[in-house]
Amino acid sequence: MSQQEPDDSRNCIVAVTLDEESIGRSGPDIEHERAIAIYDLVEKNLFAPQGGGEGPYTLHIGITGNRLMFDIRREDGSPVMVHLLSLTPFRRIVKDYFMICDSYYQAIRTATPDKIEAIDMGRRGIHDEGSRTLQERLAGKVRIDFETARRLFTLISVLHWKG
């Protein structure tokens, strides 16, 4: 008997909310970046909590101490799981990511196309590192594909952004 691939058509996030008490509101630029990150994540993702049954899911994100809280629920609001994810493994990556993003935004004003491309390749490399770290940290708890990990990492980065 061959093992079938799971049907992931319903294993997805259909809504993301941020806990205003723990994350708080920011200036209009940061709020705009958060909205874009959430839109991109909801638009296309694979999200399958272990033992969570079939989706789709909603994701409420908050910060508790030094941990990112993923409150995962079904579309009807019934709880699936709450997963706390340490932010420590992401601090250096997010810091490096913001430094290279700053360099990129400065370069697009004055640098040559080759220099801009080199900086952008570095930015993508750091983003990929953060995405892989996120996939590793969620392994065995929530199954996500690499593109979903990239979108979630973008959202985590924007949550760290102080402007």
From Swiss-Prot:
Native organism taxonomy: Bacteria, Pseudomonadati, Pseudomonadota, Alphaproteobacteria, Hyphomicrobiales
HAMAP family (alphabetical): UPF0262 (MF_00678)
Entry similarity comment: Belongs to the UPF0262 family.
Organism: Rhodopseudomonas palustris (strain BisB18)
Domain of life (superkingdom): Bacteria
Name of the protein in question: UPF0262 protein RPC_4416
Entry-linked InterPro entries: UCP032146
